[in-house]
Amino acid sequence: RYTTRVVDIVAPVGRGQRGLIVSPPRSGKTTLLLHIAEAIREKYDEQIHLMILLVDERPEEVTEFRRALPGAEIYASSNDEASRNHTRIAELAIERAKRLVEAGKDVFLLMDSITRLARAYNGAMSSGKGGRNRATGSGGITIGALEVPRRLFAAARNTREAGSLTILATALIQTNSRADEAIFME
């Protein structure tokens, strides 16, 4: 596919790196992630453990990933689930990735999307214990809501004694939402 070849030429991704695919809604970010996943499976299936995290995604998208990548380790929460379910599945996926790295594996985690994950943490924090008493920052984001998504994204690393964790995530911009802009800027 040309898309993955262009990405490889313009912005090559090395083991242990983290990267963002930033664009407006409905511009093909999820399709690009699917193409990248297919390319990784085709070229590095034996060397790299591929994981996919789909947060607050349409059920059709989840099904498309599962059909296109049989046997892939896919963690997904659909958009008809509660915010707490989105946050749980993300934490489960990142902890699994960390354990694989500790076991010496090279892991590539594709995440769609870090914006929706941050929204889920914001929703979970504002509706959880003491949520109504929590202070809000720019864009109506609850203080501390972006801490966990930032930590999850920062988990990417290349270790000497074990494996590596590479994370490539999507981020939304130009949504006319101050919250999404605050998430992206953070």
What residue ranges belong to the model's regions?
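P-loop NTP-binding catalytic core
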Residues: 1-21, 27
